[in-house]
């Protein structure tokens, strides 16, 4: 007998954005519920696994922490492929990191799947007195691209879990819509040739 799959969905999610915006800290907070004041400069790419129970489904997230430095762009570009979700992070206290979001959107358009889910995240909201990026400005920017926006603090865990859960839910809903609306010429084929994926689903 074959064993039941450990999860219903498997999603690859990328964290991208300038160096120092807190991508690694967001990942550590979500995956391990930990925090470090030490600056983490990611060398290349690292990832963590986190399993969620969402809307009655078990979802396994593979979250990749990609370096933001320019010299790593050529290394990380290949990792855009196959990602179902991309979380674009900027630092609320660093105007340049927000200005560069537009360039990162260009990277996504160039390397990622056309229908990949995206989420704009303004991190470090705990530094209230140092905040320079206006929330409404960031929200308007996100709306112009048709993507959700949320502000977080990895240090005090504000909205961190919500950030990843909302991304997972958006991906799941998008894939559910795709599965439930097959093209007319695919219906007969699918009824005759059922997939042998063992219940696991991984889509771009």
UniProtKB/Swiss-Prot annotation:
One example of a Gene Ontology biological process annotation: intracellular protein transport
Residues where lipid is bound covalently (S-geranylgeranyl cysteine): 204
Topology with respect to the bilayer: Lipid-anchor
PROSITE patterns, A to Z: RAB (PS51419)
Cleavable signal peptide: none
Presence of keyword Electron transport: no
Coiled-coil regions listed: none
Main location: membrane
Basic and acidic residues: compositionally biased ranges: 182-191
Basic residues bias locations: 192-204
A molecular function (GO) term: GTPase activity
Region (Disordered): 182-204
Family stated for the protein in its record: Belongs to the small GTPase superfamily. Rab family.
Source species, domain of life: Eukaryota
Protein name listed in UniProt: Ras-related protein Rab-1D
Record's keyword terms, sorted: Cell membrane, GTP-binding, Lipoprotein, Membrane, Nucleotide-binding, Prenylation
Family annotation (SUPFAM superfamilies): P-loop containing nucleoside triphosphate hydrolases
A Pfam entry, by short name: Ras
InterPro entries, sorted: P-loop_NTPase (IPR027417), Rab (IPR050227), Small_GTP-bd (IPR005225), Small_GTPase (IPR001806)
């Amino acid at each position: 007998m074959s064993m039941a799959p450990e999860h219903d969905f498997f999603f690859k999610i990328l964290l991208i954005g300038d160096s120092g915006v807190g991508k690694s800290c967001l990942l550590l907070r979500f995956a391990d519920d930990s925090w470090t004041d030490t600056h983490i400069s990611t060398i290349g790419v690292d990832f963590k696994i986190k399993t969620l129970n969402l809307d009655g489904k078990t979802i396994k997230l593979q979250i990749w922490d990609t370096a933001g430095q320019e010299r790593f762009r050529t290394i990380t570009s290949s990792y855009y492929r196959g990602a179902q979700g991309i979380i674009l992070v900027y630092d609320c206290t660093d105007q340049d990191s927000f200005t560069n979001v537009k360039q990162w959107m260009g990277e996504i358009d160039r390397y990622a799947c056309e229908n990949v889910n995206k989420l704009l995240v303004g991190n470090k909201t705990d530094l209230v007195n140092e905040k320079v990026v206006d929330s409404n400005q960031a929200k308007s920017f996100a709306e112009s691209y048709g993507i959700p926006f949320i502000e977080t603090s990895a240090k005090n865990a504000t909205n961190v879990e919500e950030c990843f859960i909302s991304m997972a839910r958006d991906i799941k809903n998008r894939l559910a819509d795709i599965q439930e609306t097959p093209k007319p010429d695919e219906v007969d084929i699918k009824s005759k040739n059922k997939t042998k994926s063992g219940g696991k689903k991984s889509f771009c």
